[in-house]
Amino acid sequence: MIRIVIKASVLAVLAACLALGQTSKPSPKPAASFVGQWKVGLGIGSETFTITLEKDGKATKSHGDPNGKWTMFGDEARISWDDGWHDAIRKAGNHYEKAAYAPGKSFTDPPDNITGATRTEPL
């Protein structure tokens, strides 16, 4: 009888831990939190440019080839530009940053530069 009570107690504790773990996971950022205009660093000195992320997945920028597409991946917005560059905008502590990846690299490679990113205007 004691074995049955111990097994039931262990199962109850495991079930409670599993339920607690599922409810305490952070939810991914909604795409709406990234839609809008972003002022980001170019990665050269203090130069900046603007990235615009639209609700339909279209992305434009004020530097280089202006066209691209973006999607959410976890908690970051990933942008693939027609010129081969890739950018990721993500929360880093209490601010946002833009990580840039040169043509031929993927988002799993180390970025070529990381600069600040500030949303200047929601759409």
Language model features: what each stretch is:
Residues A12-G21:
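Hydrophobic h-region of N-terminal signal peptides that target proteins for export
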Residues T23-P26, G74, A102-L123:
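Edge beta-strand at a domain terminus
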Residues G36, E97-K98:
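Conserved glycine-centered beta-strand/turn positions repeated across beta-sheet architectures
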Residues S24-K39, T50-D56:
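N-terminal helix-cap/turn-to-beta initiation motif at the start of protein domains
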Residues M1-V10:
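Bacterial N-terminal signal peptides that target proteins for export
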Residues V40-D87, Y101:
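N-terminal glycine/threonine-rich, aromatic-flanked beta-hairpin/loop signature
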Residues A88-H95:
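Extended Gly/Ser/Thr-rich low-complexity repeat segments
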